[in-house]
Amino acid sequence: MDVAESPELDPHSPEDEEQPALSDDDILRESGSEQDLDGAGERASDLEEEENATRVQSQEETRSDEEDRASEPKSQDQDSEAHELSRGPAGSPCEEGDDVEEDGTSDLRDEASSVTRELDEHELDYDEEVPEEPAPAAQEEEAEKAGAEEEEEKGEGAPGEEGKPDVQSVGEQEPTEAAKEKKKEDDDGEIDDGEIDDDDLEEGEVKDPSDRKVRPRPTCRFFMKGNCTWGMSCRFIHPGVNDKGNYSLITKAEPFPPNGAPPLGPHPLMPANPWGGPVVDEILPPPPPEPPTESAWERGLRHAKEVLKKATIRKEQEPDFEEKRFTVTIGEDDREFDKENEVFRDWNSRVPRDVRDTTLEPYADPYYDYEIERFWRGGQYENFRVQYTEAEPYHNYRERERERERENRQRERERERERDRERERRQRERERERERERDKERQRRKEEWERERAKRDEKDRQHRDRDRDKDREKDKEKPKPRSPQPPSRQAEPPKKESTSVGPQVKRADEWKDPWRRSKSPKKKLGVSVSPSRARRRRKTSASSASASNSSRSSSRSSSYSGSGSSRSRSRSSSYSSYSSRSSRHSSFSGSRSRSRSFSSSPSPSPTPSPHRPPVRTKGEPAPPPGKAGEKSIKKPAPPPAPPQATKTTAPGPEPAKPGDLREARRKERQTRTPPRRRTLSGSGSGSGSSYSGSSSRSRSLSVSSVSSVSSATSSSSSVHSVDSDDMYADLASPVSSASSRSPTPAQTKKERGKSKKEDGVREEKRRRDPSAQPPKSSKAPAGGKASQQAAAPQPAVPGQPQQGSFVAHKEIKLTLLNKAADKGSRKRYEPSDKDRQSPPAKKANLSPDRGSRDRKSGGRMGSPKPERQRGQNAKAPAAPADRKRPLSPQSKGSSKVTSVPGKATDTATAGTKSGKASTLSRREELLKQLKAVEDAIARKRAKIPGKV
C-alpha cells in the first residue's frame, strides 16, 4: 500500500478539475493520471468539502438528468464498487504517506465496510431495481458515482484530518451511503436493460412526461471510461452505441454531443479498462457504428423514393397511364390486389438473369443476391441481414435492378396496351352484336306488326263495310234503328269494306301514312277544302296521336304517330299537349283552312272548354244549340245535334240536297256556333262556322275517319275517358286507338279509300251523332249538313266536345272531335267539300251509314262489334251520355237514338240507357280498345319505320 499505488487511484485532482463532469474524473482516474498525494491530507479535507459540494451538484445534476438511466445505477454501482475496492487498498497508502498509516488502515477498514455496505446496497439494486422514480435514479447514480469518488477521496483524504479521518471518512461515507440508500430506495425499482420502468404503474397510469422526456439522458460516465458493465442495457447514453434506439429521439442536453467526437475519445481507453473486456463484449464495438448500408428506416425511405420515381417515370412514358389508373379491368384489378406479391412475380425472370450475371459481380451469389434483391427491392420483408451483406453489391444491384425494372415496366406497358386493345376490340364486337340483335328485333317486330296490321286491316275493312251498311240502314231507319243498328252496321261493314277496298286501291290512301293520317282526297270529291282538310287531318291526326300520347302513355304507337304527326303537323304537337289543345288544334287546323273565325273561337274556348266542358257539358247538354251545343256539349252535343237534327231532319232523308245539307250545316253550325261562342269564344260566323265546321269537321272527320271511326267507337267506349281519351281514344283507346291507328293507317287509307266520302259522312255523322246528328245523317240533306255542321262544331267541339267530353268524357268529345278531325283529315281534300257542298249530300246519304259504320268500324277496328256499337253510341250518346253521364260510355242505343236529329230527348234517354247498358259493354270495349290501341301502336311502330 505505497503511495505509489495511491497516485494511480488518486482521484483528487481529477475530481477537483472535473467535479462537474465526473465521467472525466473516472476516465482520468482509469487512464492512470498520477498526481502527487503529498498534500493529499490537506487536499483531502478540501476535497471532501469539494466533494460534498460536488455531491450536491451531482445530485442536482442527476435530478435534472434523465431518469432513463435506471439501468446505470448498477453499472455505476459496480464501477463505484470497483473503484472503492481498488481505492480501498490505495487509500491507506495515501493516508500513510500523509501521516498515519493506522488511520489509513482504519480508513481502509471503514472503506471496506462502506464498500460492503455499498455492495449490499448495490446488490439490492441489482435485485430490486424498480423504475419508480427515474429522476431519483439518475440522481442516485450520479450520487453513487460522486459517493464512490468521495469515498475514495475520503479514504485518501482522511489523513488530512489524521485522527479524525476514520471517523470523518466513515461519517462522510455513511452520510453518502445514507443518501445513496435513500436514493436507491427511491430507485429501488429502477429497471435494468432498458426495460420500461412502469412496472409499478397501474394500468393506464402514466408517468409525468416532464420527468422522463424533458431531461436529456446524460452520457454514461463509466462508459466514457470504458468501465460501464451494463453495455447496451445501460440507462445512460453510450455515445456511439446505444444512443440509436428509441432514446435517440429524446433531445440530449449532455455535455457531449451524443454522436460528437468526445464520445469517440473514450473508446481508445476502453481496452485499458479492467472492466472494458466485458463491456466490449456486450457492446460489440458499435458495429461500425452505422453499417454504411441502411437502417430499416432508411431502406423504407429509399424504397418509397424509388417507387415514387418509378411512378413518375411511368407517368411520363406511358401516355395512357392516367386512363389505366382509372380503367378497371379484371387483369389490372388482379394486379392491384396482388401488389404484395408483385415483387415475386417478376422473380422468375429476374433470377435467371441474376444467375447469368453472377460471374461479373463478385458479390452476386445468385442465391443471396436474389434474396437480397428480393427483400431489398420489395421492401416487403425487412431482412436486416441485408445491411451487412449488401453494402457493396447493392450498387451494382441497383443498376441491374433498374435495368430489370425498366424492362419489366416496358413489358408491363406492352402487356397493358395489349390488354386495352383486346378490351376495346371485345367491346366493339359486343356493341356490334348488340346492334345486330337490335336490328333483328326491330325487323321481327316490324314484320309482326305488319302481319298484325294486315290482319287487323282486313278485319277492320270487313267491320267497316258492315258498319257502313248498318249505319246506312240505321241512318235510314233513324235513331231507333240505329240503336239496334250496330249489328246491322256490323253487317254493313262489309259494304264499307268493299267501298273502302275499292277506294283504297284507287285512292292515294294506298300510301300508308307513317303517322297514319288518313288521306282521303278522293273521299270527298269536293277537293276545294281537301288541302286544308288534309292539312287539318294531318294535324288532327297528329294531334290525335299526340293527344293520345299525352293523354295516354299507354299508346306507345301514339307517341310514334303523335310525334311523327307533331312533326308533320305543327298543330299536332300542341294537340299532343292535351285533349284541350288537341281540340283547339283540330279546331284550329280545321278552322284554319276553312274558317279561321271558327277556329279561333272554338280554339281558345275549347281549350279552356275542354276542361270546363265537363261542367259545361253537364250544364250545356241542355244547350244543344248548334255548334256551341255540340262543341261545348259534344257530350251534350246530341242536343245540338237535335237542333241540327231538326234542321237536318227538315232537309229530311239522306238524299237531302247538298245545298240543303250545306244550309242545314250552316244553320246547325250557326246554331252550334252560338253555343260554341258560349263555350268557345263564340267567334264563329254562320258561314265561317259552317266552313269552319266543315273544315274542322273535315279535319275532325279526317282524324275521325281514322280516329273518328275508332273515335266514335272510342267515344262510346272512351266515354269514361276524358276528351283527350276520346280524341286520343281513337289513337289511345284500345279500340279507338286500334281502329284509329292500326286500322288508321290501313283503315284510314282503306276507309278513306273505301268510303272517304263515307268516312267523311260517317265522321260528320259521328260528329252529328255526338251532336245528335247521326240520326239526321239518316236524312241525307240534314244528315249531310248536320254531319258537316256536327263535324264543324266538332272541330270546334274538338275544343268543346272536349269540354263536353271533359264533362262526361273529355276523351269522348275529343274522340268525336278527332273523328271530326279524322273526317276533316280524310275529307281534307274531299270530305270537307263533301260535307259542305254536294259531297255533304253524298255524305249525308253516306254519312249516316258511313258515320255509323265509321264509328262502328272504328270500334270494330279496335273491337269491331263493341266499337261499332260504341261508335254509334259514342256518336249520339257520346254527346248525350257525355252530357248526362260523362262516365257512362256513350250508349250505343243512345248514339243511335241521338242520331235521330229531332230526338234530342231520345238521344238523352238513349244516352242514359246506352250509358247504363254501355257501362259494362263499355268496360269491355275499353279493354278491347286498350288492346286495340296497343296493337295499333305496334302496327304503327312497325309501319312507321318502314314508311319513314
UniProtKB/Swiss-Prot annotation:
The keyword Zinc applies. Residues 1-219, 272-296, 388-922 are annotated as: Disordered. The modification N6-acetyllysine is found at residue 810. SUPFAM superfamilies: CCCH zinc finger (SSF90229). The keyword Iron-sulfur does not apply. It comes from the Eukaryota. Residues 541-602, 688-721, 732-746, 774-804, 902-919 have a biased composition (Low complexity). Residues 15-25, 95-105, 121-132, 139-154, 187-203 have a biased composition (Acidic residues). One of its GO terms (molecular function) is zinc ion binding. Residues 395-460, 916-945 form a coiled coil. The modification Phosphoserine is found at residues 6, 33, 45, 58, 64, 71, 75, 80, 92, 106, 114, 169, 483, 528, 530, 532, 838, 847, 863, 888, 891. Its main location: nucleus. Residues 603-612 have a biased composition (Pro residues). The modification N-acetylmethionine is found at residue 1. A zinc finger (C3H1-type) spans 215-241. Keywords: Acetylation, Coiled coil, Isopeptide bond, Metal-binding, Methylation, Nucleus, Phosphoprotein, Ubl conjugation, Zinc, Zinc-finger. There is a cross-link at residues 506, 618, 657, 813, 903 (Glycyl lysine isopeptide (Lys-Gly) (interchain with G-Cter in SUMO2)). It is found in: Nucleus. Residues 70-86, 106-120, 177-186, 204-213, 392-480, 506-516, 657-666, 756-770, 820-837 have a biased composition (Basic and acidic residues). Residues 888-898 have a biased composition (Polar residues). Gene3D superfamilies: Zinc finger, CCCH-type. PROSITE patterns: ZF_C3H1. PANTHER family: ZINC FINGER CCCH DOMAIN-CONTAINING PROTEIN 18 (PTHR46582:SF1). Interacts with ZFC3H1 in a RNase-insensitive manner. This is Zinc finger CCCH domain-containing protein 18. The gene is Zc3h18.
